[in-house]
Amino acid sequence: MHFETVIGLEVHVELKTDSKMFSPSPAHFGAEPNSNTNVIDLAYPGVLPVVNRRAVDWAMRASMALNMEIATESKFDRKNYFYPDNPKAYQISQFDQPIGEHGYIDIEVDGETKRIGITRLHMEEDAGKSTHKDGYSLVDLNRQGTPLIEIVSEPDIRSPQEAYAYLEKLRSIIQYTGVSDCKMEEGSLRCDANISLRPYGQEEFGTKAELKNLNSFNYVRKGLEYEEKRQEEELLNGGEVLQETRRFDESTGKTILMRVKEGSDDYRYFPEPDIVPLYVDEAWKERVRQTIPELPDARKEKYVNEYGLPAYDAHVLTLTKEMSDFFEGAVEAGADVKLTSNWLMGGVNEYLNKNQVELQDTKLTPENLAGMIKLIEDGTMSSKIAKKVFPELAENGGDAKQIMEDKGLVQISDESVLLNFVNEALDNNPQSVEDFKNGKGRAKGFLVGQIMKASKGQANPQMVNKLLQQELDKR
Protein backbone atom coordinates (compact mmCIF):
# COMPACT_ATOMS: atom_id res chain seq x y z
CA MET A 1 0.00 0.00 0.00
CA HIS A 2 1.24 3.49 -0.86
CA PHE A 3 0.51 6.53 1.27
CA GLU A 4 0.12 10.22 0.55
CA THR A 5 1.68 12.66 3.03
CA VAL A 6 -0.48 15.54 4.24
CA ILE A 7 1.23 18.43 6.04
CA GLY A 8 -0.05 21.67 7.53
CA LEU A 9 2.16 24.29 9.20
CA GLU A 10 1.45 26.72 12.02
CA VAL A 11 3.95 29.56 12.01
CA HIS A 12 4.24 32.04 14.88
CA VAL A 13 5.82 35.38 13.99
CA GLU A 14 6.73 38.04 16.56
CA LEU A 15 5.92 41.56 15.37
CA LYS A 16 8.78 44.00 15.93
CA THR A 17 6.68 46.72 17.53
CA ASP A 18 8.20 48.98 20.16
CA SER A 19 5.66 47.96 22.80
CA LYS A 20 3.69 44.85 23.66
CA MET A 21 0.32 43.68 22.40
CA PHE A 22 -1.75 44.88 25.34
CA SER A 23 0.64 46.90 27.52
CA PRO A 24 3.13 49.77 27.12
CA SER A 25 6.12 47.61 28.15
CA PRO A 26 9.03 47.48 25.67
CA ALA A 27 8.97 44.49 23.33
CA HIS A 28 12.69 44.34 22.56
CA PHE A 29 14.78 41.16 22.47
CA GLY A 30 17.85 40.67 24.66
CA ALA A 31 17.05 42.76 27.76
CA GLU A 32 17.87 41.65 31.31
CA PRO A 33 15.40 38.98 32.49
CA ASN A 34 12.12 40.39 33.81
CA SER A 35 13.13 44.00 33.08
CA ASN A 36 10.55 44.62 30.31
CA THR A 37 7.42 44.01 32.35
CA ASN A 38 4.66 45.98 34.06
CA VAL A 39 1.47 45.30 36.04
CA ILE A 40 -0.46 44.22 32.92
CA ASP A 41 2.18 41.67 31.91
CA LEU A 42 2.30 40.36 35.48
CA ALA A 43 -1.51 40.06 35.67
CA TYR A 44 -2.05 42.27 38.71
CA PRO A 45 -5.71 42.36 39.80
CA GLY A 46 -7.80 45.13 38.26
CA VAL A 47 -5.54 45.97 35.31
CA LEU A 48 -7.03 46.17 31.82
CA PRO A 49 -5.42 45.43 28.44
CA VAL A 50 -5.28 48.06 25.67
CA VAL A 51 -4.85 46.87 22.07
CA ASN A 52 -1.66 48.01 20.30
CA ARG A 53 -2.89 49.67 17.10
CA ARG A 54 0.49 49.31 15.38
CA ALA A 55 0.31 45.55 15.95
CA VAL A 56 -3.13 45.49 14.30
CA ASP A 57 -1.80 47.51 11.34
CA TRP A 58 1.09 45.09 10.90
CA ALA A 59 -1.11 42.02 11.22
CA MET A 60 -3.25 43.48 8.44
CA ARG A 61 -0.18 44.29 6.33
CA ALA A 62 1.09 40.71 6.66
CA SER A 63 -2.38 39.36 5.84
CA MET A 64 -2.60 41.47 2.68
CA ALA A 65 0.90 40.43 1.58
CA LEU A 66 -0.29 36.82 1.91
CA ASN A 67 -3.31 37.51 -0.32
CA MET A 68 -5.78 37.26 2.56
CA GLU A 69 -9.18 38.83 3.13
CA ILE A 70 -9.28 41.28 6.06
CA ALA A 71 -12.21 40.76 8.40
CA THR A 72 -14.38 43.82 8.91
CA GLU A 73 -15.12 42.51 12.40
CA SER A 74 -12.83 40.32 14.49
CA LYS A 75 -12.51 39.71 18.20
CA PHE A 76 -10.14 38.52 20.90
CA ASP A 77 -10.66 35.42 23.04
CA ARG A 78 -9.22 33.85 26.15
CA LYS A 79 -7.33 30.59 25.69
CA ASN A 80 -7.19 29.04 29.14
CA TYR A 81 -4.22 27.01 30.34
CA PHE A 82 -1.86 27.07 33.30
CA TYR A 83 1.89 27.29 33.00
CA PRO A 84 4.47 29.16 35.13
CA ASP A 85 5.39 31.56 32.29
CA ASN A 86 1.72 32.52 31.79
CA PRO A 87 0.81 34.73 34.80
CA LYS A 88 -2.85 35.24 33.84
CA ALA A 89 -3.46 31.49 33.40
CA TYR A 90 -4.90 32.39 30.01
CA GLN A 91 -3.57 33.77 26.73
CA ILE A 92 -5.37 36.48 24.78
CA SER A 93 -5.74 35.16 21.23
CA GLN A 94 -8.29 35.07 18.39
CA PHE A 95 -10.35 31.89 18.11
CA ASP A 96 -13.25 31.95 15.66
CA GLN A 97 -12.99 35.48 14.19
CA PRO A 98 -9.38 36.08 13.07
CA ILE A 99 -8.13 39.28 11.44
CA GLY A 100 -7.23 37.53 8.13
CA GLU A 101 -8.55 34.52 6.21
CA HIS A 102 -8.39 32.67 2.87
CA GLY A 103 -4.92 33.52 1.59
CA TYR A 104 -2.20 31.71 -0.35
CA ILE A 105 1.42 31.79 -1.45
CA ASP A 106 3.07 30.19 -4.47
CA ILE A 107 6.16 28.03 -3.96
CA GLU A 108 8.62 26.45 -6.38
CA VAL A 109 9.83 22.87 -5.97
CA ASP A 110 11.86 21.07 -8.66
CA GLY A 111 11.02 23.80 -11.16
CA GLU A 112 7.27 23.45 -10.63
CA THR A 113 5.06 26.15 -9.11
CA LYS A 114 2.49 25.10 -6.53
CA ARG A 115 -0.07 27.18 -4.64
CA ILE A 116 -0.36 26.57 -0.89
CA GLY A 117 -3.52 27.87 0.75
CA ILE A 118 -3.46 29.78 4.03
CA THR A 119 -6.46 29.21 6.28
CA ARG A 120 -6.06 32.16 8.61
CA LEU A 121 -3.85 34.70 10.30
CA HIS A 122 -4.73 35.68 13.84
CA MET A 123 -3.25 37.94 16.50
CA GLU A 124 -2.27 36.87 19.98
CA GLU A 125 0.21 37.57 22.75
CA ASP A 126 3.34 35.54 23.37
CA ALA A 127 4.04 33.73 26.65
CA GLY A 128 7.10 34.17 28.83
CA LYS A 129 10.07 31.83 28.72
CA SER A 130 10.80 29.02 31.18
CA THR A 131 14.29 27.59 31.63
CA HIS A 132 14.40 24.29 33.48
CA LYS A 133 17.45 23.47 35.62
CA ASP A 134 18.20 20.53 37.91
CA GLY A 135 15.46 20.67 40.52
CA TYR A 136 14.19 24.17 39.74
CA SER A 137 12.94 26.41 36.93
CA LEU A 138 13.60 30.03 35.98
CA VAL A 139 10.92 32.22 34.42
CA ASP A 140 11.62 35.31 32.28
CA LEU A 141 8.48 37.35 31.54
CA ASN A 142 10.10 39.82 29.12
CA ARG A 143 8.50 37.98 26.21
CA GLN A 144 5.10 37.79 27.93
CA GLY A 145 2.65 39.93 25.95
CA THR A 146 4.87 40.42 22.87
CA PRO A 147 2.64 40.75 19.78
CA LEU A 148 2.38 37.58 17.69
CA ILE A 149 0.67 36.59 14.51
CA GLU A 150 -0.03 32.92 13.88
CA ILE A 151 -0.23 31.89 10.23
CA VAL A 152 -2.01 28.58 9.64
CA SER A 153 -1.64 26.87 6.28
CA GLU A 154 -4.18 24.65 4.60
CA PRO A 155 -3.19 20.95 4.57
CA ASP A 156 -1.93 21.42 0.99
CA ILE A 157 1.71 20.48 1.58
CA ARG A 158 2.63 17.00 0.34
CA SER A 159 6.28 16.56 1.26
CA PRO A 160 8.96 17.79 3.69
CA GLN A 161 10.63 19.49 0.72
CA GLU A 162 7.45 21.47 0.00
CA ALA A 163 7.24 22.40 3.69
CA TYR A 164 10.79 23.79 3.52
CA ALA A 165 9.97 25.80 0.38
CA TYR A 166 6.78 27.14 1.99
CA LEU A 167 8.68 28.34 5.07
CA GLU A 168 11.38 30.00 2.97
CA LYS A 169 8.78 31.85 0.91
CA LEU A 170 6.68 32.82 3.93
CA ARG A 171 9.71 34.18 5.79
CA SER A 172 10.79 36.12 2.72
CA ILE A 173 7.37 37.78 2.31
CA ILE A 174 7.09 38.68 6.00
CA GLN A 175 10.61 40.14 6.05
CA TYR A 176 9.84 42.25 2.99
CA THR A 177 6.77 43.72 4.70
CA GLY A 178 8.99 44.91 7.56
CA VAL A 179 6.69 43.66 10.33
CA SER A 180 9.22 41.11 11.68
CA ASP A 181 12.85 40.13 11.24
CA CYS A 182 11.85 36.42 11.41
CA LYS A 183 14.97 35.30 13.29
CA MET A 184 14.46 31.73 14.47
CA GLU A 185 17.53 31.94 16.71
CA GLU A 186 15.87 34.79 18.65
CA GLY A 187 12.45 33.15 18.67
CA SER A 188 10.79 35.73 16.42
CA LEU A 189 9.75 32.92 14.05
CA ARG A 190 8.65 29.54 15.35
CA CYS A 191 6.99 26.65 13.57
CA ASP A 192 4.82 23.69 14.55
CA ALA A 193 4.06 21.06 11.94
CA ASN A 194 1.07 18.73 11.63
CA ILE A 195 1.58 15.59 9.56
CA SER A 196 -0.60 12.61 8.68
CA LEU A 197 -0.65 9.86 6.06
CA ARG A 198 -3.54 8.45 4.05
CA PRO A 199 -3.79 5.84 1.28
CA TYR A 200 -3.52 7.40 -2.17
CA GLY A 201 -6.97 8.23 -3.50
CA GLN A 202 -8.57 8.52 -0.07
CA GLU A 203 -10.31 11.85 0.61
CA GLU A 204 -10.47 11.54 4.39
CA PHE A 205 -7.43 12.71 6.33
CA GLY A 206 -5.45 10.33 8.51
CA THR A 207 -4.73 10.89 12.21
CA LYS A 208 -2.18 13.66 12.58
CA ALA A 209 0.77 14.17 14.89
CA GLU A 210 1.99 17.64 15.83
CA LEU A 211 5.75 18.26 15.84
CA LYS A 212 7.37 20.84 18.12
CA ASN A 213 10.93 21.98 18.96
CA LEU A 214 11.63 22.68 15.30
CA ASN A 215 14.31 25.35 15.70
CA SER A 216 15.37 25.69 12.06
CA PHE A 217 13.94 25.06 8.63
CA ASN A 218 16.30 22.10 8.30
CA TYR A 219 14.91 20.61 11.51
CA VAL A 220 11.39 21.07 10.18
CA ARG A 221 12.35 19.08 7.11
CA LYS A 222 14.24 16.40 9.06
CA GLY A 223 11.48 16.06 11.65
CA LEU A 224 8.85 15.62 8.96
CA GLU A 225 11.00 13.10 7.08
CA TYR A 226 11.41 11.00 10.21
CA GLU A 227 7.73 11.25 11.14
CA GLU A 228 6.71 10.33 7.59
CA LYS A 229 8.71 7.08 7.86
CA ARG A 230 7.54 6.37 11.42
CA GLN A 231 3.86 6.68 10.54
CA GLU A 232 4.27 4.64 7.35
CA GLU A 233 5.94 1.78 9.25
CA GLU A 234 3.21 1.91 11.90
CA LEU A 235 0.45 1.67 9.31
CA LEU A 236 2.14 -1.03 7.22
CA ASN A 237 2.59 -3.14 10.36
CA GLY A 238 -1.12 -2.93 11.11
CA GLY A 239 -0.75 -0.38 13.89
CA GLU A 240 -2.59 2.86 14.53
CA VAL A 241 -1.25 6.41 14.43
CA LEU A 242 -2.34 8.32 17.54
CA GLN A 243 -3.15 12.02 17.74
CA GLU A 244 -0.27 13.28 19.83
CA THR A 245 2.33 16.00 20.22
CA ARG A 246 5.92 14.95 19.54
CA ARG A 247 9.23 16.71 20.01
CA PHE A 248 12.06 16.62 17.48
CA ASP A 249 15.34 15.51 19.07
CA GLU A 250 18.18 17.26 17.24
CA SER A 251 20.84 14.83 18.49
CA THR A 252 19.11 11.66 17.25
CA GLY A 253 17.06 13.06 14.36
CA LYS A 254 13.98 11.34 15.79
CA THR A 255 10.65 12.54 17.16
CA ILE A 256 9.76 11.75 20.77
CA LEU A 257 6.33 11.62 22.39
CA MET A 258 5.60 14.66 24.56
CA ARG A 259 1.89 14.30 25.33
CA VAL A 260 -1.43 13.25 23.89
CA LYS A 261 -2.63 16.10 21.68
CA GLU A 262 -5.20 18.44 23.15
CA GLY A 263 -8.21 19.73 21.24
CA SER A 264 -9.62 23.26 21.27
CA ASP A 265 -12.22 22.22 23.88
CA ASP A 266 -9.39 21.66 26.37
CA TYR A 267 -8.60 25.38 26.26
CA ARG A 268 -12.19 26.48 27.06
CA TYR A 269 -12.10 29.45 24.68
CA PHE A 270 -14.50 32.31 25.37
CA PRO A 271 -14.64 35.96 24.21
CA GLU A 272 -12.22 38.30 26.01
CA PRO A 273 -14.55 40.45 28.17
CA ASP A 274 -12.01 43.28 28.63
CA ILE A 275 -11.53 44.02 24.90
CA VAL A 276 -14.34 45.15 22.61
CA PRO A 277 -14.62 43.61 19.12
CA LEU A 278 -12.29 45.07 16.51
CA TYR A 279 -13.94 46.86 13.57
CA VAL A 280 -11.88 47.63 10.47
CA ASP A 281 -13.49 49.87 7.85
CA GLU A 282 -12.44 50.18 4.19
CA ALA A 283 -10.55 53.42 4.82
CA TRP A 284 -8.36 51.70 7.45
CA LYS A 285 -7.74 48.76 5.12
CA GLU A 286 -6.74 51.10 2.31
CA ARG A 287 -4.31 53.03 4.53
CA VAL A 288 -2.57 49.78 5.42
CA ARG A 289 -2.62 48.56 1.81
CA GLN A 290 -0.69 51.66 0.77
CA THR A 291 2.16 50.71 3.13
CA ILE A 292 2.89 47.33 1.51
CA PRO A 293 6.31 47.50 -0.19
CA GLU A 294 7.49 45.69 -3.30
CA LEU A 295 7.35 41.96 -2.48
CA PRO A 296 9.80 39.20 -3.53
CA ASP A 297 7.77 37.88 -6.48
CA ALA A 298 7.57 41.36 -8.01
CA ARG A 299 11.31 41.87 -7.57
CA LYS A 300 12.07 38.46 -9.01
CA GLU A 301 10.02 39.28 -12.11
CA LYS A 302 11.84 42.62 -12.43
CA TYR A 303 15.27 40.98 -12.19
CA VAL A 304 14.40 38.52 -14.95
CA ASN A 305 12.54 40.88 -17.30
CA GLU A 306 14.38 44.17 -16.76
CA TYR A 307 17.85 43.10 -15.62
CA GLY A 308 18.05 39.96 -17.78
CA LEU A 309 19.09 37.67 -14.93
CA PRO A 310 18.40 33.92 -15.03
CA ALA A 311 15.39 32.83 -12.96
CA TYR A 312 17.68 30.99 -10.53
CA ASP A 313 19.77 34.10 -9.82
CA ALA A 314 16.61 36.15 -9.32
CA HIS A 315 15.24 33.55 -6.90
CA VAL A 316 18.40 33.46 -4.76
CA LEU A 317 18.81 37.26 -4.69
CA THR A 318 15.22 37.85 -3.57
CA LEU A 319 15.15 35.22 -0.79
CA THR A 320 15.96 37.95 1.74
CA LYS A 321 15.16 41.65 1.52
CA GLU A 322 18.61 42.45 2.88
CA MET A 323 20.37 40.71 -0.03
CA SER A 324 17.93 42.10 -2.59
CA ASP A 325 18.33 45.68 -1.33
CA PHE A 326 22.11 45.26 -1.35
CA PHE A 327 22.04 43.98 -4.93
CA GLU A 328 19.93 46.91 -6.12
CA GLY A 329 22.17 49.37 -4.28
CA ALA A 330 25.30 47.99 -5.95
CA VAL A 331 23.70 48.10 -9.40
CA GLU A 332 22.56 51.69 -8.77
CA ALA A 333 26.17 52.49 -7.83
CA GLY A 334 27.24 51.41 -11.33
CA ALA A 335 28.19 47.75 -10.92
CA ASP A 336 27.48 45.28 -13.72
CA VAL A 337 24.24 43.37 -13.05
CA LYS A 338 25.53 39.86 -13.76
CA LEU A 339 28.90 40.35 -12.06
CA THR A 340 27.13 41.70 -8.97
CA SER A 341 24.76 38.74 -8.96
CA ASN A 342 27.68 36.30 -9.29
CA TRP A 343 29.59 37.93 -6.44
CA LEU A 344 26.62 38.05 -4.07
CA MET A 345 25.71 34.41 -4.73
CA GLY A 346 29.35 33.29 -4.75
CA GLY A 347 32.09 35.15 -2.90
CA VAL A 348 29.84 37.13 -0.56
CA ASN A 349 27.69 34.15 0.45
CA GLU A 350 30.78 31.98 0.94
CA TYR A 351 32.29 34.61 3.23
CA LEU A 352 29.07 34.96 5.26
CA ASN A 353 28.68 31.20 5.67
CA LYS A 354 32.35 30.65 6.54
CA ASN A 355 32.31 33.36 9.22
CA GLN A 356 28.72 32.69 10.32
CA VAL A 357 27.72 36.35 10.05
CA GLU A 358 24.93 38.31 8.39
CA LEU A 359 25.50 40.89 5.68
CA GLN A 360 24.77 43.74 8.11
CA ASP A 361 27.51 42.43 10.44
CA THR A 362 30.21 43.18 7.83
CA LYS A 363 31.70 46.47 6.63
CA LEU A 364 30.45 45.78 3.11
CA THR A 365 28.30 48.43 1.48
CA PRO A 366 26.68 48.41 -1.95
CA GLU A 367 29.07 51.22 -2.90
CA ASN A 368 32.36 49.57 -1.90
CA LEU A 369 31.36 46.25 -3.47
CA ALA A 370 30.33 48.11 -6.64
CA GLY A 371 33.73 49.82 -6.63
CA MET A 372 35.50 46.46 -6.62
CA ILE A 373 33.25 45.02 -9.33
CA LYS A 374 33.88 48.02 -11.59
CA LEU A 375 37.64 47.42 -11.21
CA ILE A 376 37.12 43.81 -12.32
CA GLU A 377 34.93 44.93 -15.20
CA ASP A 378 37.44 47.44 -16.60
CA GLY A 379 40.36 45.02 -16.23
CA THR A 380 42.15 46.88 -13.43
CA MET A 381 41.65 43.95 -11.05
CA SER A 382 41.57 40.24 -11.89
CA SER A 383 39.08 37.89 -10.27
CA LYS A 384 41.97 36.18 -8.48
CA ILE A 385 43.15 39.46 -6.97
CA ALA A 386 39.56 40.34 -6.08
CA LYS A 387 39.31 37.17 -4.01
CA LYS A 388 42.33 38.35 -2.00
CA VAL A 389 41.00 41.89 -1.62
CA PHE A 390 37.43 40.96 -0.71
CA PRO A 391 37.98 39.62 2.87
CA GLU A 392 39.70 42.90 3.81
CA LEU A 393 36.84 44.85 2.25
CA ALA A 394 34.28 42.82 4.20
CA GLU A 395 36.13 43.06 7.53
CA ASN A 396 37.33 46.67 7.47
CA GLY A 397 35.52 48.42 4.63
CA GLY A 398 37.40 51.04 2.65
CA ASP A 399 38.26 51.26 -1.03
CA ALA A 400 39.04 48.12 -3.04
CA LYS A 401 41.66 49.82 -5.21
CA GLN A 402 43.48 51.18 -2.16
CA ILE A 403 43.43 47.76 -0.49
CA MET A 404 44.84 46.21 -3.67
CA GLU A 405 47.68 48.75 -3.78
CA ASP A 406 48.43 48.46 -0.05
CA LYS A 407 48.73 44.69 -0.37
CA GLY A 408 50.98 44.95 -3.41
CA LEU A 409 48.42 43.18 -5.55
CA VAL A 410 48.23 45.66 -8.42
CA GLN A 411 47.49 43.82 -11.65
CA ILE A 412 50.37 43.63 -14.10
CA SER A 413 49.30 45.06 -17.45
CA ASP A 414 52.69 46.17 -18.77
CA GLU A 415 53.09 44.31 -22.08
CA SER A 416 56.87 43.97 -21.87
CA VAL A 417 56.70 42.48 -18.36
CA LEU A 418 53.94 40.09 -19.40
CA LEU A 419 55.91 39.00 -22.49
CA ASN A 420 58.75 37.94 -20.22
CA PHE A 421 56.36 35.71 -18.23
CA VAL A 422 54.86 34.33 -21.47
CA ASN A 423 58.18 33.46 -23.10
CA GLU A 424 59.53 31.99 -19.88
CA ALA A 425 56.50 29.68 -19.69
CA LEU A 426 56.92 28.66 -23.34
CA ASP A 427 60.64 28.01 -22.95
CA ASN A 428 60.12 25.94 -19.79
CA ASN A 429 57.29 23.84 -21.24
CA PRO A 430 58.22 22.80 -24.82
CA GLN A 431 56.00 19.71 -24.64
CA SER A 432 52.93 21.86 -23.95
CA VAL A 433 53.84 24.05 -26.94
CA GLU A 434 54.06 20.94 -29.10
CA ASP A 435 50.75 19.62 -27.71
CA PHE A 436 49.03 22.90 -28.56
CA LYS A 437 50.36 22.79 -32.12
CA ASN A 438 48.93 19.27 -32.39
CA GLY A 439 45.44 20.52 -31.53
CA LYS A 440 45.33 19.85 -27.79
CA GLY A 441 43.46 22.89 -26.48
CA ARG A 442 44.13 22.03 -22.84
CA ALA A 443 47.80 22.79 -23.36
CA LYS A 444 47.06 26.50 -23.68
CA GLY A 445 45.13 26.45 -20.41
CA PHE A 446 48.12 24.82 -18.73
CA LEU A 447 50.45 27.51 -20.07
CA VAL A 448 48.12 30.27 -18.85
CA GLY A 449 48.17 28.64 -15.43
CA GLN A 450 51.98 28.62 -15.40
CA ILE A 451 52.08 32.31 -16.31
CA MET A 452 49.56 33.23 -13.60
CA LYS A 453 51.52 31.16 -11.09
CA ALA A 454 54.79 32.87 -11.99
CA SER A 455 53.15 36.30 -11.66
CA LYS A 456 51.53 35.30 -8.34
CA GLY A 457 48.11 35.79 -9.86
CA GLN A 458 48.76 39.43 -10.72
CA ALA A 459 49.04 39.17 -14.50
CA ASN A 460 46.15 40.65 -16.48
CA PRO A 461 44.42 37.46 -17.71
CA GLN A 462 42.98 39.06 -20.86
CA MET A 463 46.39 40.36 -21.93
CA VAL A 464 48.04 37.05 -21.02
CA ASN A 465 45.67 35.18 -23.33
CA LYS A 466 46.25 37.63 -26.15
CA LEU A 467 50.07 37.65 -25.83
CA LEU A 468 50.27 33.88 -25.35
CA GLN A 469 48.33 33.27 -28.55
CA GLN A 470 50.52 35.78 -30.33
CA GLU A 471 53.74 34.05 -29.22
CA LEU A 472 52.39 30.55 -29.91
CA ASP A 473 51.59 31.59 -33.47
CA LYS A 474 55.25 32.52 -33.93
CA ARG A 475 56.57 29.11 -32.86
From Swiss-Prot:
EC number: 6.3.5.-
GO terms, molecular function: asparaginyl-tRNA synthase (glutamine-hydrolyzing) activity; ATP binding; glutaminyl-tRNA synthase (glutamine-hydrolyzing) activity
Pfam family, one: GatB_Yqey
Any coiled-coil regions, as ranges: none
InterPro entries: Asn/Gln-tRNA_amidoTrfase_suB/E, Asn/Gln-tRNA_Trfase_suB/E_cat, Asn/Gln_amidotransferase, Asn/Gln_tRNA_amidoTrase-B-like, GatB, GatB_C_1, GatB_Yqey_C_2, Gln-tRNA_amidoTrfase_suB_CS
Superkingdom: Bacteria
Gene3D superfamilies attached to this UniProt entry: 1.10.10.410, GatB domain, N-terminal subdomain
Root EC class: ligase
Enzymatic reactions: L-glutamyl-tRNA(Gln) + L-glutamine + ATP + H2O = L-glutaminyl-tRNA(Gln) + L-glutamate + ADP + phosphate + H(+); L-aspartyl-tRNA(Asn) + L-glutamine + ATP + H2O = L-asparaginyl-tRNA(Asn) + L-glutamate + ADP + phosphate + 2 H(+)
GO terms (BP aspect): glutaminyl-tRNAGln biosynthesis via transamidation; translation
Keyword annotations: ATP-binding, Ligase, Nucleotide-binding, Protein biosynthesis
Entry annotated with the keyword Hydrolase: no
Family affiliation: Belongs to the GatB/GatE family. GatB subfamily.
Complex and partners: Heterotrimer of A, B and C subunits.
Annotated NCBIfam families: gatB, PRK05477.1-1, PRK05477.1-2, PRK05477.1-4
Function comment: Allows the formation of correctly charged Asn-tRNA(Asn) or Gln-tRNA(Gln) through the transamidation of misacylated Asp-tRNA(Asn) or Glu-tRNA(Gln) in organisms which lack either or both of asparaginyl-tRNA or glutaminyl-tRNA synthetases. The reaction takes place in the presence of glutamine and ATP through an activated phospho-Asp-tRNA(Asn) or phospho-Glu-tRNA(Gln).
Protein name: Aspartyl/glutamyl-tRNA(Asn/Gln) amidotransferase subunit B
Species this protein is from: Staphylococcus carnosus (strain TM300)
Lineage: Bacteria, Bacillati, Bacillota, Bacilli, Bacillales
